[in-house]
């Protein structure tokens, strides 16, 4: 079994592998791997040092991950489109049911855009932080394609982790350039917010 460098997600102290395994492509939205095939791929990656994986409510890869977790001690990050207590609670329970566990390491609001969407989703964020206080969630965060949202989330309160889109060409950044996103990420990181990159290959 190979080792990979481990790093802390910001000031949280949560240790994760330097690379995070994104599971979107194995699910029905893209390659359509069976849960068994997806779990085999995750097990292969685990043997090569991966200890952190990312999914989402919409990806429909909980079955793949659930099987992999029978053999592998991954930290799991998931995210969902939720805007109030009811939708956040339902999404969290779907994650627990799908993963066959009563805890998730990271739970994020999916595809936040700005300070305005953060304000509009405050009830959901507050609920997730309540669940964090109860020990059901490790860290709370947001995913985004917007540099402005990275900056806003860093000081919004209740955000431990940000999952921003960043790659060499700046492909997919919605409100600026790669340099703008890099500056926003550096700002958030300087405040102790955990950062893990999305779509680093474009």
Task: Identify the meaning behind each predicted range.
Residues 1-74:
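N-terminal binding-site loop/beta-alpha segment at the start of enzyme catalytic domains
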Residues 6, 61, 112-202:
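Beta/alpha (TIM)-barrel catalytic core signal, keyed to glycine-rich beta->alpha loops juxtaposed to Asp/Glu
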Residues 9, 21, 53, 76, ...:
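Conserved, mostly hydrophobic/aromatic
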Residues 10-15, 65-73, 93-102, 153-157, ...:
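Acidic (Asp/Glu)-rich catalytic clusters
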Residues 32-45, 85-100, 144-153:
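Short, acidic/polar
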Residues 50, 101-104, 137, 159:
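A structural motif
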Residues 74-86, 107-112:
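A short, structured active-site edge motif that brings together acidic residues
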Residues 96-116:
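Active-site groove signature of glycoside hydrolases
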């Amino acid at each position: 079994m190979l080792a990979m460098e481990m790093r802390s997600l910001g000031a949280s102290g949560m240790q994760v592998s330097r690379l995070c395994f994104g599971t979107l492509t194995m699910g029905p939205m893209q390659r359509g791997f069976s849960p068994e095939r997806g779990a085999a791929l995750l097990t292969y990656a685990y043997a090569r040092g991966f200890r952190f994986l990312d999914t989402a409510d919409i990806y429909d890869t909980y079955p793949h991950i659930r099987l992999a977790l029978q053999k592998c001690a991954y930290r799991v990050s998931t995210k969902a489109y939720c805007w109030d207590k009811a939708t956040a609670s339902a999404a969290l329970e779907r994650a627990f049911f799908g993963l066959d566990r009563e805890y998730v390491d990271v739970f994020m609001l999916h595809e936040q855009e700005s300070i305005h969407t953060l304000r509009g989703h405050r009830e959901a964020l507050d609920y997730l932080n309540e669940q964090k206080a109860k020990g059901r969630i490790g860290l709370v965060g947001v995913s985004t394609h917007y540099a402005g949202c990275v900056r806003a989330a860093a000081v919004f309160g209740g955000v431990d982790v940000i999952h921003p889109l960043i790659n060499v060409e700046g492909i997919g950044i919605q409100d600026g350039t790669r340099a703008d996103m890099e500056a926003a990420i550096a700002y958030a990181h300087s405040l102790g917010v955990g950062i893990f990159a999305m779509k680093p290959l474009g």
